[in-house]
Amino acid sequence: MSAAIYLVKGREKSVVRRHPWIFSRGIDRVEGNPQLGETVDVYGHDGKWLAKAAYSPESQIRARVWSFEKQDVNRAFFVKRIQDAQLLREDVIERDGLTGYRLIAAESDGMPGVTIDRYQNFFVCQLLSAGAEHQKQNIVDALIEVFPDCNVYERSDVSVRKKEGLQETTGVLHGEMPPKSVVIEENGVKISVDIVGGHKTGFYLDQRDSRQQAMKYVKDKEVLNCFSYTGGFGLYALKGGAKRVINADVSQPALDTAKFNAELNEFDISKKRAVFLNADVFKLLREYRDQGTKFDVVIMDPPKFAESKAQLNGACRGYKDINMLAMQILKPGGTLLTYSCSGLMDQVLFQKIIADAAVDAGRSVKFVERFEQAADHPTDTAYPEGFYLKGFACKVL
């Protein structure tokens, strides 16, 4: 008989509504001696069976639901999950000509704590929960069954694993070591990805739709691409006919890759058309403001400022500061494309921050378009936390 957890009376509601998280305060008792990541049965206070979940004794999220059906959590289970996820994405893969996409979006694909990104034939896994770690071999075996020629690499070098009682880890799980550059394609744009050393799993796949939508704002414009990383938005700006694009980032290796990506797409990278500037964006924005340098379009896609609720207030100040500075260096009628990937900051709060930035900048600002994560990053209706990326196109008058 498997181990089991019984919920506090009244705590069943979220599970009945199929939310996949069960917090420690919602558990009345544990029967058996479940180990880190082990699958347990979940029961209501009345003894009614509710779900199969992975047990995590060191996390505030004490259990994460694998299934709301009575089924074994084994290789066959993950094969079905992966097949369903691939089928869900077939339309967008064909529509956008993708050779890089998110295959598994954790809880939203019924695999809590599991992220799998595909770059050509390299599948990059981030296993962020005790249950994901416990099921690692089943997940890898399932990938091999669905994609027989795949290579699987792990990028679980994420600090959140510590909350689950896990160490950070990386390495080959199956097949070959990824090369320094794996070239993917999206919307006809070629992008070199460093799976082993790049941010996240190598690239920001979630911004693909926003990159495409940005093109309509840049034709014949002077564009400043802040926190450019390997040039994603800058590439689309060049494709969209921008007069000039300045890509600014603090990482020289990222800028070198951005330049390589521009060359890969055969874009004009003369200094009249494309600049790759190693700079602290906060300092750079202030320098441009003080010098009176103006742009037609500013793209503001910073890294996550808030990893926890304790950091949220500081993150709000950071977002307001950079957006205020961006508004101050825009020409009248210019466009600010601004984004936040902090899940703790919802769209309403982000919109308020932009409004506060407009007041501090002394500019009249209009929201003209809203953005969210790309279609291969779905959000399950029972798991609103899966919606994390939000953005706005703003006209700055």
UniProtKB/Swiss-Prot annotation:
GO molecular function, one term: RNA binding
PUA domain location: 2-80
Source species of the chain: Vibrio vulnificus (strain YJ016)
PROSITE patterns xrefs: PUA (PS50890)
Protein name, per record: Ribosomal RNA large subunit methyltransferase I
GO cellular component terms, semicolon-separated: cytoplasm
E.C. number(s) listed in UniProt: 2.1.1.191
Originating gene: rlmI
Annotated compartments: Cytoplasm
Catalytic activity: cytidine(1962) in 23S rRNA + S-adenosyl-L-methionine = 5-methylcytidine(1962) in 23S rRNA + S-adenosyl-L-homocysteine + H(+)
Stored InterPro entries: PUA (IPR002478), PUA-like_sf (IPR015947), PUA_sf (IPR036974), RLMI (IPR023542), RlmI-like_PUA (IPR041532), SAM-dep_methyl-trfase (IPR019614), SAM-dependent_MTases_sf (IPR029063)
Keywords: Cytoplasm, Methyltransferase, RNA-binding, rRNA processing, S-adenosyl-L-methionine, Transferase
Primary location recorded for the protein, binned into one broad class: cytoplasm
Family: Belongs to the methyltransferase superfamily. RlmI family.
Function: Specifically methylates the cytosine at position 1962 (m5C1962) of 23S rRNA.
UniProt xrefs under SMART domains: PUA (SM00359)
